[in-house]
């Protein structure tokens, strides 16, 4: 925007300068032409003054009829001079007079020569020369042209100053204080977690109880505390429990004597930390779940009861590592 405004100011200034040059050139030519046109008139005036001077000399030296002859012929001579002096005298005199304030270098004394040699009887002859001055309005359109020319030159810098005023605070912007980033608090590591996975029947069906119990026992689970099945360190049930298996239906318990029952699925869970290597225990847990699902015709699901995916398995492993690091 500043560049556009600067370009506009340059164009306006150039136009104003060109207008002033054209106006000055036009005025100079007009004044020069008026001076050339006034020269024949001045010669006529000087000739007329010489005639008047000769008549005055004759009047002073002559007597009688010569004086009467001068009085009788003076009006005739005045009429001849008035006829010889055309009206352009009034048309040229105003432009020369109006040009004086603009061109003080011009020599106006030439216009003042006739009054010095004009005698007293010739004064009534010069009065009608200055009386018809209604033709001066022709010079009126010249004077208003000079006034509006400098106006755009003085008015042009004003918007430039206004345009640069708002740029002062922008020139030296103060650096804003940069807010230091708040220290990121490390998420506290979990010291314990529970890994859960499910073995469920397909949608709209349930698992057979007798087939389910046989597959659970084949996977190494033994019925024990809380009426649920546990997988111990040793397949014969000795050693600490690594993970457990419960019924998906509340209260989650089993009755080994019941053969005729059905369930939508079972839940296998492992508490971390646990005995031994938790990652190896997790692999054994996943193998047991996959064995039971294959035997009963079910599927392995995650803790949200969604299809188990490799991404979810890696998430479980990351949780186990986090707990191990927190308890190291």
Curated annotation (Swiss-Prot):
Residues 1-6 are periplasmic. The chain crosses the membrane at residues 7-27. It is found in: Cell inner membrane. Keywords: Cell cycle, Cell division, Cell inner membrane, Cell membrane, Membrane, Transmembrane, Transmembrane helix. Residues 99-115, 123-171 have a biased composition (Low complexity). Residues 51-63 have a biased composition (Acidic residues). One of its GO terms (cellular component) is plasma membrane. GO terms for biological process: division septum assembly; FtsZ-dependent cytokinesis. It is a single-pass type I membrane protein. Belongs to the ZipA family. Essential cell division protein that stabilizes the FtsZ protofilaments by cross-linking them and that serves as a cytoplasmic membrane anchor for the Z ring. Also required for the recruitment to the septal ring of downstream cell division proteins. Interacts with FtsZ via their C-terminal domains. This is Cell division protein ZipA. It comes from Shigella boydii serotype 18 (strain CDC 3083-94 / BS512). The lineage of its organism: Bacteria, Pseudomonadati, Pseudomonadota, Gammaproteobacteria, Enterobacterales.
């Amino acid at each position: 925007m500043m560049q556009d405004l600067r370009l506009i100011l340059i164009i306006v200034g150039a136009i104003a300068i060109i207008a002033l040059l054209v106006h000055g050139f036009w005025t100079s030519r007009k004044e020069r032409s008026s001076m050339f046109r006034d020269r024949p008139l001045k010669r006529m005036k000087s000739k007329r003054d010489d005639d008047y001077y000769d008549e005055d000399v004759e009047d002073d030296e002559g007597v009688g009829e010569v004086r009467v002859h001068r009085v009788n012929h003076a009006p005739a001579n005045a009429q001849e001079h008035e006829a010889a002096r055309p009206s352009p005298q009034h048309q040229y005199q105003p432009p020369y007079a109006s040009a004086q304030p603009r061109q003080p270098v011009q020599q106006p004394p030439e216009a003042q020569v006739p009054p010095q040699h004009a005698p007293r009887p010739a004064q009534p002859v010069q009065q009608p020369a200055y009386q018809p001055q209604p033709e001066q309005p022709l010079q009126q359109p010249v004077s208003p042209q000079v006034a509006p020319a400098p106006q755009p030159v003085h008015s042009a810098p004003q918007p430039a100053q206004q345009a640069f005023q708002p740029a002062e605070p922008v020139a030296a912007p103060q650096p804003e204080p940069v807010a230091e980033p708040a220290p990121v608090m490390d998420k506290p590591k979990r010291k314990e977690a529970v890994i859960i996975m499910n073995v469920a029947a397909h949608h709209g069906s349930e698992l057979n109880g007798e087939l389910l119990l046989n597959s659970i026992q084949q996977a190494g689970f033994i019925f024990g505390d809380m009426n649920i099945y546990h997988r111990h360190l040793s397949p014969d049930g000795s050693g600490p429990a690594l993970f457990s298996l419960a019924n998906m239906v509340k209260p989650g318990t089993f009755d080994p004597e019941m053969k005729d029952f059905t369930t939508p699925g079972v839940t296998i869970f492992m508490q971390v930390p646990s005995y031994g290597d938790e990652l190896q225990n997790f692999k054994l847990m996943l193998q047991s779940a996959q064995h039971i699902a294959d035997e009963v015709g079910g599927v392995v699901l995650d803790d949200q009861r969604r299809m188990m995916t490799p991404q979810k398995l890696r998430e479980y492993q990351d949780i186990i590592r986090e707990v191990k690091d927190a308890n190291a």
